[in-house]
Amino acid sequence: MHLGHAYAALFAWRAARTVGGRFQIRIEDIDKGRCRPAFADAIVEDLDWLGLDWDGPVMRQSDNLADYGRAIERLEALDVLYPCFCTRSEIRAEIARADAAPHGPDGALYPGTCRVLSRDQRRARIALGRPFALRLNMDKAMALAGPLDWHDRALGRQPCDPAGAGDVVVARKDTPTSYHLAVCVDDHRQ
């Protein structure tokens, strides 16, 4: 854990304890390529060394894959997911070709190449064994959800526009969930 993470944990712990709230630990370990159990264990040891206590057991995302699967099933039932067969390099090339590619806060957004594929085209690619990720059709999802907001204790009602993130990936071929989906499910649970 680096100093910034330690500071954030101390700040969150103090804020929770000051108002009688709960301080919970969640290990976001779904990326098996970068996450190691030893890293997670070291984080817990560091928090303990800092003298922090937490409410409930340490939650590990890798223990909750079934919950994320149920969330994907629900999104599929709402017809807001679609398979995306594009590789990262294909997406970069498509964005480079577009003069005015849409951009979010973290750079260019997915251009929606596979969003416009027909059901037959999607089925044919899947039948050929083409790997794919599942993306959230943000336009459809926002039409179902309507305006979104959240409450900040200091600033009051704050509008939220997830459409700025574009059609996010909710599951990949190598991981049954994505960060975007997992943190939403976990935030709701916690």
Predicted features along the sequence, with ranges:
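N-terminal Rossmann-like or analogous alpha/beta NTP/dinucleotide-binding catalytic cores
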Residues: M1-P102, H188
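Active-site cores that bind ATP or allylic diphosphates and position pyrophosphate for catalysis
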Residues: S89-Q190
